[in-house]
A protein has these predicted regions:
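Multi-pass alpha-helical membrane architecture of UbiA-family
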Residues: 1-314
């Protein structure tokens, strides 16, 4: 593996693409009532949004880098053939990558805030700095603590759905005349509700996948004394939690489709619910092998991607 390929693998380029897709679809699909309202300046400039997207991508990429830096010993046990830190990049090089990506992410985020929010740019800056600190804390300590690490990762992914909406609301709050012109559009449309629903969906699906990944990494986590859900509660209880969580997601999908009457996405959401139900049922008979959990992790990632793509039809 050459160093360029290794770097893209280190920053989890597929996950970064998914985050970028989430942000773009929230901005263009879920915010479509503001695009169509005909009010000049109803949304922040495309440049400011693009810079915000790049900023978040860099900060999340930095989070993946520092995670692998702290996980060297665990990865030597769980996936020695995929080891990057200490094998392809030295620990010093890895720390340099982390610092550069973090600094670039914060600076680009600040520029985005200045362009769109003027004097309120510090709010975006503070949010991005908090996210950076949260991802670092996760890798250095919280990852090894019961449930906390799973929640931090789930929050970080869900934040990619929530951030474009927050960015637009901050922009409008700083432009009172524009806000007064689009207030009725915001109130009458389901825009804000849909953003919250997709944020919750991203959080729950990521939480499920993180629990499954903990089961996949059971061997290495035990050796490094991590207190993950499968270690503390055991595989059987973990499977029960997964099944109940999947059923909860299915009920929420069907409920929100019914309440909002989003007919364009109805078929998509029902199909997703049925697939998730099959997944829940199969967990009852799941063999205790890492490869099986890896397959479930991939399935959950595909389901999340389908959920993101469904924004196009809302």
């Amino acid at each position: 593996m050459n160093k360029i390929t290794a770097f893209f693998k280190l920053v989890r380029w597929q996950n970064l693409l998914m985050i970028a897709l989430m942000m773009i679809l929230v901005y263009h699909s879920l915010m479509s009532p503001l695009h169509a309202c005909g009010v000049m300046g109803a949304l922040p400039s495309a440049l400011s949004f693009l810079l915000l997207l790049i900023s978040l991508i860099f900060i999340v990429a930095a989070g993946y880098v520092i995670n692998d830096y702290f996980d060297v010993e665990i990865d030597k046990v769980n996936k020695p053939e995929q080891l990057i830190v200490s094998k392809i990049f030295s620990e010093t090089e890895t720390k340099v990558f982390y610092v550069l990506l973090t600094i670039l992410g914060i600076i680009i985020g600040a520029i985005s805030g200045v362009i769109a929010l003027n004097s309120k740019f510090y709010i975006i800056l503070a949010i991005l700095a908090l996210l950076t600190a949260l991802l670092y804390s996760y890798s250095s300590s919280y990852k090894r603590k019961f449930v906390v690490g799973n929640i931090i990762v789930s929050f970080s992914v869900a934040f990619a759905v929530f951030l474009p909406w927050l960015f637009v609301m901050l922009y409008l709050s700083d432009n009172v005349l524009i806000l007064s012109s689009v207030r009725d559009v915001i109130i009458s449309s389901s825009m804000s509700k849909l953003v919250m629903i997709y944020t919750a969906f991203a959080f729950l699906m990521t939480l499920l996948r993180e629990i499954v990944k903990d089961a996949e990494d059971l061997k290495g986590d035990k050796l490094t004394r991590c207190r993950t859900i499968p270690i503390v509660l055991g595989i059987k209880k973990m499977n029960v939690i997964l099944i109940l969580s999947i059923l909860l997601i299915c009920m929420l999908l069907i409920y929100f489709t019914y309440v909002l009457y989003v007919m364009h996405s109805y078929i998509t959401l029902i199909i997703m619910s049925l697939i998730l139900l099959c997944l829940a049922l199969s967990l009852t008979y799941l063999p205790r092998k890492d490869i099986s959990y890896h397959k479930y992790s991939v399935f959950l990632k595909i389901m999340m991607l389908l959920g993101i793509i469904s924004m196009i039809f809302v």
